[in-house]
């Protein structure tokens, strides 16, 4: 049982429309913002909502191409518990645009490569062997731990595709350490939340057992 969450940095989600036409899937769309920053509260709320209502075995998140993958992983890890577990992130890279993207958007491009567990290179099936090898070496230099596939996706066997659903993320994204207070009880005055979305996220976390 699969559900798909699409995040497009714009008002129109073309990929979501195509998926709805060709597959019997639950499609969730988040547009006009990026789930790694401006929409991170909506993103976390949506994941908890999907987990508690649709309850799919797998939720595929396709973020916008201008998103920071490390931030997206961090946002999910904040709400991760026994029913929400991260698989290895897969970055799909347009091999023909690599040099241009690294020149114009180096921070985003490097983050998406370095945070991935697997990197699948697209649009290089007609490139010369030395070009593919050169690109692979550049990717290895940025992320030596990732599995890098420069051959066309149709050349990947069934075992490879199946392993996408069984390979779990085994590395933590560094987060700021918070000092624990050695108190039996804690009282807060004038506590507030910035939005209704934050309240919904907090309440869903309580119901789901995220806080113990």
Model-based region annotation:
Residues 7-9, 124, 153:
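Short, ordered loop/turn segments at secondary-structure junctions
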């Amino acid at each position: 049982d699969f559900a798909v969450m699409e995040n497009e940095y714009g008002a129109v989600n073309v990929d979501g429309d195509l998926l709805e036409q060709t597959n019997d899937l639950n499609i969730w769309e988040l547009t006009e913002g990026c789930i790694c920053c401006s929409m991170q509260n909506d993103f976390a709320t949506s994941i908890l909502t999907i987990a508690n209502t649709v309850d799919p075995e797998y939720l595929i998140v396709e973020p916008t191409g201008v998103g920071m993958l490390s931030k997206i992983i961090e946002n999910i890890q904040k709400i991760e518990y026994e029913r929400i577990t991260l698989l290895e992130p897969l970055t799909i890279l347009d091999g023909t645009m690599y040099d241009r993207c690294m020149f114009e958007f180096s921070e985003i491009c490097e983050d998406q490569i370095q945070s991935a567990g697997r990197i699948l290179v697209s649009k290089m099936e007609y490139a010369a062997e030395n070009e593919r090898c050169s690109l692979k070496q550049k990717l290895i230099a940025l992320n030596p731990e990732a599995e890098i596939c420069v051959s066309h996706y149709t050349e990947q066997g069934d075992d490879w595709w199946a392993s996408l659903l069984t390979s779990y993320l085994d590395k933590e994204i560094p987060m700021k350490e918070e000092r624990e207070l050695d108190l039996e009880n804690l009282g807060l005055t004038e506590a507030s939340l910035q939005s209704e979305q934050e309240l919904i996220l907090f309440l869903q976390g309580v119901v789901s057992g995220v806080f113990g």
